[in-house]
């Protein structure tokens, strides 16, 4: 069974991200190859992984509507002093 990929894109970042993440950074999670393309700090990864896993496996996740009309999930990094927002979407 072929699974989907999930793309995480930084859509907002304020202050100083200690990991150096910037708006536009992308990470692809591929369940077929078990590979991750790109980089994501451990703090953002551990907090976003349940939502990423649910998206990849057809789980129920709260969605927002992106500018292109597609459904996306949003996730906030746990660093409250330097907020970073990820947009999570399924890619083929």
Language-model features and meaning:
Residues 4, 61-92:
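Short, compact, well-ordered microdomains
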Residues 11-16:
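Short alpha-helix capping/helix-loop boundary micro-motifs
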């Amino acid at each position: 069974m072929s699974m989907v990929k999930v793309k995480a894109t930084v859509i907002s970042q304020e202050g100083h991200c200690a990991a150096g993440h910037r708006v536009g950074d992308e990470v692809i999670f591929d369940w077929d190859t078990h590979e991750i393309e790109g980089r994501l700090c451990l703090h953002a990864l551990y907090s976003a992984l349940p939502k990423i896993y649910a998206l990849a496996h057809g789980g129920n996740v709260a969605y927002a509507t992106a500018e292109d009309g597609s459904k996306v999930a949003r996730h906030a990094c746990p660093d409250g002093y330097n907020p970073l927002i990820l947009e999570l979407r399924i890619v083929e």
